[in-house]
Amino acid sequence: MTASAAPPGWPGDLTGSAAPAVAGPAGLAEFNGLPADAASRALLACCSSERWAGVLLAGRPFPSAAAALRCSDGAVAGLEPADLREALAGHPRIGERAGAAGSWSRQEQAGVAGTDPATLRALAAGNEAYEQRFGHIYLACATGRTAAGLLALLQDRLGNEAGTEWGVVRSELQKINRIRLGKLLGGAGGDGGASGDGGAGGGGA
């Protein structure tokens, strides 16, 4: 497929091999009109699950941002365990510095910035304990939450059974993806209730 330039309002080059930075308010029409390869890269920057991105691609063109968000919710609900792990792989631990592809997480974990060293150490220890118990990173909707709040939530979730915790992870991923997709479509995601986000752990947004 021939590469095309990123439409106005989209940061970065969606035609190259690298994932785009956090997208600005491009709008639904621009998203619907992107070539499939460019749209796929934009979606995978929101969530690294290939299955989730594929469902969203197949759903285009969306008549409204709300329809796209409903599609995202349904896609997350249909993810298999391997798909969920693939999605988790795209999130840094909460409290850790995000890498080059972690623009979303840096935004979402703003409440962790400037946290006192003792709380950061407790988060690091909590992340390790969580991963030892469940075998994957701690994913939580970090948007609007403080480091202390995320730590308290982590400690509470350590008491969950594995099956229960996977259900919580799926719910948190839905929130994160709604916030990110909403921003991609021009701010339609809303807050944690309508959209949500987390640092995956920080994993999360």
Protein language model regions, located:
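Residues forming anionic-ligand binding surfaces in small-molecule and nucleic-acid pockets
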Residues: 133
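Conserved catalytic/binding loops enriched for acidic/polar residues
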Residues: 138
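Aromatic-anchored, charged helix-turn/loop surface patch used as a conserved interaction hotspot
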Residues: 1-130, 175-190, 202-205
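Long, amphipathic alpha-helical surface segments
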Residues: 147-191, 196-205
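Short glycine-enriched loops at secondary-structure junctions
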Residues: 143-145
